Design a protein with these regions (language model features):
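A contiguous pocket-lining binding segment that forms or flanks enzyme active sites
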Residues: 186-198, 202
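Short, electropositive alpha-helical surface patch
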Residues: 58-65, 121-133, 164-170, 231-249
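N-terminal pre-domain/capping segments
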Residues: 1-99
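Hydrophobic faces of well-ordered beta-strands that scaffold small-molecule active sites
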Residues: 6-12, 40-42, 69-71, 109-111, ...
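Active-site acidic/histidine proton-transfer and metal-coordination neighborhood
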Residues: 80-180, 187
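Single conserved hydrophobic/aromatic residue that forms the stacking wall/gate
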Residues: 252-260
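Active-site beta-loop-alpha junctions enriched in small/polar residues
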Residues: 11-15, 45-47, 74-76, 114-116, ...
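Aromatic-lined glycan-binding groove of carbohydrate-active enzymes
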Residues: 198-230
Length: 260
């Protein structure tokens, strides 16, 4: 029998973490459990700075509470860069993230693929696909074959990260799983996700491209995001209600591992 199940958690901590008297990353498991959550996406957006020993201690504290960690890799990953050095560095950032993720007892590494820059979307995607293939090879060679890379859908139109672009990256290897950020997709489509039918179309597209079993285990982000003509402008709080998760909550989500 599969041990997969739907999980809910936060990406990083909010102001409530300090307000409740927590000070250390070692407090994250207790903080998460008190909210009734069972997942936590550790943020390495500004660099992988969490030591492996501390990560292992966090994993030991999280295990009895059935909390599963994932890791968001550095924001400056650019798998589509015109500069080869930046593409190669991106692979190193994924390797660093994989090491921390394993120490945390997790398996999923979420990352932004990069931007199109001064090249066509097609050219940017080809570079990202090549970098992804090399990243998978590097992870395998480094002993991280059990890690799951999760390219994320992005909110700015100039970024690489439409639903189809992310699914193309996932086609590189069966171990790659999409991170579907519904807020980002809504922003880059200028408010194109309004109903449960819109959400269902996204889920159906994933199933079509990945097959039901892979599509059932995708990683999810949800946030309210303000957008302009270029897509994402800024993140909102959940107190701002122009775009919310209600339609997707009524859709039959076929996921077995979720971060909302």
């Amino acid at each position: 029998m599969s041990d997969w199940k739907i999980r809910f958690g936060t990406a990083g901590t909010s102001d409530s973490f300090a307000a409740q008297g927590y000070k250390s990353s070692l407090d994250v498991p207790e903080y998460t459990a008190k909210m009734g959550l069972n997942a936590f996406e550790y943020q390495c957006g500004r660099g992988v700075r969490l030591g492996l020993d501390k990560a292992a201690k966090m994993a030991a504290l999280a295990g009895p509470k059935d909390i599963l960690f994932s890791v968001h890799a550095p924001y400056y990953i650019s798998m589509s860069s015109l500069e080869e050095d930046k593409r190669l560095n991106s692979i190193q950032y994924l390797l660093q993230s994989a090491a921390v993720c394993r120490a945390l007892g997790g398996r999923r590494i979420i990352f932004h693929s990069g931007s199109c820059g001064k090249q066509s979307r097609e050219a940017a995607l080809e570079k990202a696909l090549d970098t992804m293939r090399r990243a998978v090879e590097a992870l395998d060679e480094a002993g991280f074959a059990d890690m799951t890379l999760c390219p994320e859908t992005m909110g700015k139109i100039g970024q690489l990260g439409t639903l189809d672009e992310v699914l193309a990256l996932c086609a590189v290897d069966r171990r790659i799983t999409p991170c579907i950020d519904f807020g980002h997709l809504n922003a880059r489509t200028l408010g194109g996700i309004r109903s449960k039918e819109d959400y269902a179309a996204i889920l159906d597209r994933m199933a079509e491209k990945l097959g039901d079993q892979r599509a059932e285990r995708f990683h999810v982000h949800f946030s309210r995001i303000e957008y302009s003509a270029g897509g994402e402008k800024r993140h909102w709080t959940f107190a701002e209600t122009q775009f919310g998760p209600e339609p997707v909550s009524y859709t039959h989500l076929r996921a077995h591992e979720t971060v909302l």
